[in-house]
């Protein structure tokens, strides 16, 4: 078979001095960082949808890319051609993982029977590709938002027959993920939200999606899937308001339906931007709540109110993200999936490599800086000092429930408490972070 990326053998590490745009300058898979291989820290994945399914179309224009597998033809054969190119790309990019939606890899067909038959054939194709290339599946998911049947959502749809169709897709995609050795299964909100409250029963829709997620958990245990279930928060788009708005909202939902021990979160940087949060905030919140799972590494544009899905290029932003992840013990089943796409004007097929290479170097350099922050320990020391009072007698009595509100008020009066504010030293800490970032 003719190689699609025929001008490239494989992307390799050449070091910081390299000017080769098709080489890594910072990502060295075998380099040890805090005693662990860089590849094992970062667990990079490339996504199927933006990389091989998007044709460059947007709201104002038709497809701009001339991909051979996006031409008219027999759908299943084109899907197999797309898989050939995808795994050529994964291998040459040197990523250990990939991710997909069901209909990214397989034609949907005109019925559930066709959908399942097509998907079963393509799962066999993907299994063979994985065996041949050594590339593994980080996570799979089902696209329950593109087809017009999902215009009013999938699990939150007012029609239980649509709910049932979505359940069929999710079961099939979960089974496929399990068969392919996937390490996680993702549930993104899609169109689980509302356009207007005038035709929406919020309590009803919340009960529906809560039951749907409980059924997903039940099926996971029934099938013996050992991977992690992940919800991906997003505040809006495509609906006006999504029910999985941000990490904290998802945690409240999980608690309500008794799922907080069963499901974690897959955090996307651009979705944090849309929610009015920093990427750092969402990562730290998930870790604090015990539901951190995986990351969709990309970036948004603070001046635009939609999901631009650009490749991450900010070491300043991502060093702090990697710092939080390292302090929490790193990824277990999760990783860094590049949910990012080249720009519509980037029509050269090698632009796909340029985008991913830059992103991988960004995250690798961020990891190394984060490791220096962990090794130095100065930030942690200053935070510990700020909260040191809570390790004292009074602080511990409060936290252990040994003082009531009235007793605490009495204590304050008896001891003539007159606390004085202590500086938070924000500027000092920002300067400290800059030293890690820019001092060699």
Curated annotation (Swiss-Prot):
GO biological process: D-xylose metabolic process; L-lyxose metabolic process; rhamnose catabolic process
InterPro entries per UniProt: Xyl_isomerase-like_sf (IPR036237), Xylose_isom_bac (IPR013452), Xylose_isomerase (IPR001998)
E.C. numbers: 5.3.1.5
Residues at the catalytic site: 101, 104
Catalytic reaction equation(s): alpha-D-xylose = alpha-D-xylulofuranose
Database matches in HAMAP family: Xylose_isom_A
Protein name per the record: Xylose isomerase
Gene designation: xylA
């Amino acid at each position: 078979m003719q190689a699609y990326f025929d001008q490239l053998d494989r992307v390799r590490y050449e070091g910081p001095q390299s000017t080769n745009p098709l080489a890594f300058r910072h990502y060295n898979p075998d380099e040890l960082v805090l005693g662990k291989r860089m590849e094992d820290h970062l667990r990079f994945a490339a996504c199927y949808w933006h990389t091989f399914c998007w044709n460059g179309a947007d709201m104002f224009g038709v497809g701009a890319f001339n991909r051979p597998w996006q031409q008219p033809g027999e759908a299943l054969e084109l899907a197999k051609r797309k898989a050939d190119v995808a795994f050529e790309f994964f291998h040459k990019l040197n990523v250990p993982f990939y991710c997909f939606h069901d209909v990214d890899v397989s034609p949907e067909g005109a019925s559930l029977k066709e959908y399942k038959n097509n998907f079963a054939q393509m799962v066999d194709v993907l299994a063979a590709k994985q065996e041949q290339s050594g590339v593994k599946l980080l996570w799979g998911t089902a696209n329950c938002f593109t087809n017009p049947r999902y215009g009013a959502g999938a699990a939150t749809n007012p029609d239980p027959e649509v709910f049932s169709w979505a359940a069929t897709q999710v079961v099939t995609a979960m089974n496929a993920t399990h068969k392919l050795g996937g390490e996680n299964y993702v549930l993104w909100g899609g169109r689980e939200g509302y356009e207007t409250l005038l035709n929406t029963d919020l309590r009803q829709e919340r009960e529906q999606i809560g039951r749907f997620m409980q059924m997903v958990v039940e099926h996971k245990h029934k099938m013996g899937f050992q991977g992690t279930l992940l919800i991906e928060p997003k505040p809006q788009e495509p609906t006006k308001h999504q029910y999985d708005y941000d990490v904290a909202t998802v945690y409240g939902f999980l608690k309500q339906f008794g799922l907080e021990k069963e499901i974690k979160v897959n955090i996307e940087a651009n979705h944090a931007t849309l929610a009015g949060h920093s990427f750092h905030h969402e990562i730290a919140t998930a870790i604090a709540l015990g539901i951190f799972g995986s990351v969709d590494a990309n970036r948004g544009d603070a001046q635009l109110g939609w999901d631009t899905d650009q490749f991450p290029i900010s070491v300043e932003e991502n060093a702090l993200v990697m710092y939080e992840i390292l302090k929490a013990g790193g990824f277990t089943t999760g990783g860094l999936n590049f949910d990012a796409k080249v720009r519509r004007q980037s029509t050269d097929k090698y632009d796909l490599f340029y985008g991913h290479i830059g992103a991988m170097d960004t995250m690798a350099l961020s990891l190394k800086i984060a490791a220096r922050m962990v090794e130095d320990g100065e930030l942690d020391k200053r935070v510990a000092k700020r909260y040191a009072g809570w390790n004292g007698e009074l602080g511990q009595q409060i936290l252990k429930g040994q003082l009531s509100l009235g007793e605490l008020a009495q204590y304050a009066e008896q001891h003539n408490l007159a606390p004085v504010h202590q500086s938070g030293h924000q500027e000092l800490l920002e300067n400290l972070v800059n030293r890690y970032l820019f001092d060699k």
